[in-house]
Regions:
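Conserved small/polar residues in nucleotide/adenosyl-binding loops
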Residues: 149-155
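Residue-level recognition of specific faces of alpha-helices
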Residues: 12-15, 39, 61, 128
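Histidine/acidic-rich helix-loop-helix segments that form or flank divalent-metal centers
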Residues: 2-5, 102-144
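Alpha-helical scaffolds flanking conserved acidic
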Residues: 53-65, 122-126
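Helix-adjacent hinge/juxtasegments
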Residues: 55, 68-106
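Short alpha-helical hairpin
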Residues: 5-23
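Alpha-helical phosphate/pyrophosphate-handling elements in metalloenzyme active cores
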Residues: 28-58
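Active-site metal-coordination segments of metallo-dependent hydrolases
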Residues: 27-37, 80-88, 123
Length: 155
């Protein structure tokens, strides 16, 4: 990737550092989408010995890119995300991806297709880790944040 395009791409990814999720860290601050993506990628690496038949590189790529669309829309909690929200996020993400050079466009499109269909082992593991990380994070946060989490999306 050309240096200028790399910097542009990283600038979009940087937005995920400021995109907060609906849950809190154990220290009482809102978790970012970037932190969530980093942790499920680490989880993929740490459980890889349990799935020797899985392609670890593909799995880690899925974990890294799974929430890139939220760089454009922010995090909308799953329990509040509508079909219209999903379509908007997918459209904006696709528009951005089409500006990337090959082989990144094709590879990312294939990874997103696999993640959506959840037919491959890697896609099923990624989705399980995505859900598990959220459960772990909720359990690590103070119980007093639970009612706040429900109010956040209604503001």
């Amino acid at each position: 990737m050309e240096p200028e395009k790399l910097i542009e791409t990283l600038a979009v990814a940087e937005r995920l550092k400021d995109a907060t999720r609906h849950c809190y860290t154990s220290r009482g601050r809102r978790e970012s989408v970037a932190e969530h993506s980093w942790r499920i990628t680490l989880m993929a690496y740490l459980v890889s010995d349990e799935f020797p038949e899985a392609n670890l590189e593909k799995l880690m790529k899925m974990c890294l890119i799974h929430d890139l669309g939220e760089a454009f829309t922010g995090d909308i909690p799953t329990f509040e995300k509508s079909e219209k929200d999903e379509e908007k996020e997918a459209s904006l993400l696709n528009e951005w991806m089409m500006q990337l050079p090959e082989p990144f466009v094709s590879e990312m499109q294939e990874l997103y297709r696999e993640m959506e269909e959840r037919k491959t082992l890697e896609a099923r593991i990624y989705k399980a880790l995505d859900n598990l990380e959220a459960l772990i994070q909720h359990n690590e946060s103070d119980i007093s944040t639970r009612s706040e989490e429900r109010r956040v999306g209604k503001e």
